[in-house]
Amino acid sequence: MFRTMMRAKLHRATVTEANLNYVGSITIDEDLMDAVNIVENEKVQIVNNNNGARLETYVIKGERGSGVVCLNGAAARLVQPGDKVIIICYGLVAEENIHKQEPKIAVLDDDNQIIEMLGAEKAGTIL
């Protein structure tokens, strides 16, 4: 059996743009993608801390070092520049490997720069 487990997360990313007329997706600074091993065209879930909206889309590489986090297409209706979002990527893990798998979590500042890298989350942690 396989289970769907969180494998990567960009925590408290700041939305820099919302582009309604783009075809779709989320554009993410490639440095941030690399930090948590998210690849172009990979499916991600976005959770908006400001309004509670949750959506799924795919990733497009953004310019390295730019801090860009841009929701494109229909998703742009669910965010505003300045909103705080959590970007989560899941993967299928075989039952026997569940306890060996540890997610990569990058905690970001207001400029989408990494301030901390975490492994497994602990209950009660407030960031």
Curated annotation (Swiss-Prot):
One BP annotation, GO: pantothenate biosynthetic process
InterPro entries to which the protein is assigned, alphabetical: Asp_de-COase-like_dom_sf (IPR009010), Asp_decarbox (IPR003190)
Name of protein: Aspartate 1-decarboxylase
NCBIfam families with a match to the protein in the record: panD
Protein source organism: Bacillus anthracis
EC number of the protein: 4.1.1.11
Cofactor(s) the protein needs: pyruvate
Entry keyword set: Autocatalytic cleavage, Cytoplasm, Decarboxylase, Lyase, Pantothenate biosynthesis, Pyruvate, Schiff base, Zymogen
